[in-house]
Amino acid sequence: MKDEVALLATVTLLGVLLQAYFSLQVIRARRAHRVSPPLTTGPPEFERVYRAQVNCSEYFPLFLATLWVAGVYFHEGAAALCGLVYLFTRLRYFWGYARSAQLRLAPLYASARALWLLLALATLGLLAHFLPAAARAALLRLLRALLRTA
């Protein structure tokens, strides 16, 4: 059992560490710009770091759910790879947003694509799980044919 989910567990732990890093950056920005809790407004430099962290936290549960469902029901390696891409693009998003609101956009779109791909993999995996064996085999043949033409 453990071997079947080791990649998913690793990506999950990396995601948790990334969330911790984002939180530490908010603490650092609070100190640098003298914004005491519970305030969430201050200089634009602080607000960008704060908003980047909050946005990443808001999407983290969606990421975890799609990562695990895609990994268990579709393919662990594919889900883990998409998960790593998602985490890397969220890190780039955070760094970009901390510098300027405009620099957040390209990584934001890239992370959205990775999340949509995880959702698609999770959906396909669950669909295949609930289909009868004959329909599942036909779906797999169709997917292989589509991948060859792509």
Swiss-Prot record:
Name the gene behind this protein: LTC4S
Q: Which organism is it from?
A: Cavia porcellus (Guinea pig)
Q: Name one GO cellular component term.
A: endoplasmic reticulum membrane
- List the active-site residues: 31 (proton donor), 104 (proton acceptor)
* Assigned keywords, A-Z: Endoplasmic reticulum, Leukotriene biosynthesis, Lyase, Membrane, Nucleus, Phosphoprotein, Transferase, Transmembrane, Transmembrane helix
* GO process terms (BP): leukotriene biosynthetic process; leukotriene metabolic process; long-chain fatty acid biosynthetic process
Q: What is this protein called?
A: Leukotriene C4 synthase
Q: Which residues lie on this side of the membrane: Cytoplasmic?
A: 1-6, 70-73, 125-150
- InterPro entries, sorted: 5_LipOase_AP, FLAP/GST2/LTC4S_CS, MAPEG, MAPEG-like_dom_sf, Membr-assoc_MAPEG
Query: Membrane topology per the record?
Result: Multi-pass membrane protein
Instruction: Tell me which domain of life the UniProt entry assigns to the organism this sequence originates from.
Output: Eukaryota
Give EC number(s), comma-separated.
4.4.1.20, 2.5.1.-
* Spans traversing the lipid bilayer: 7-27, 49-69, 74-94, 105-124
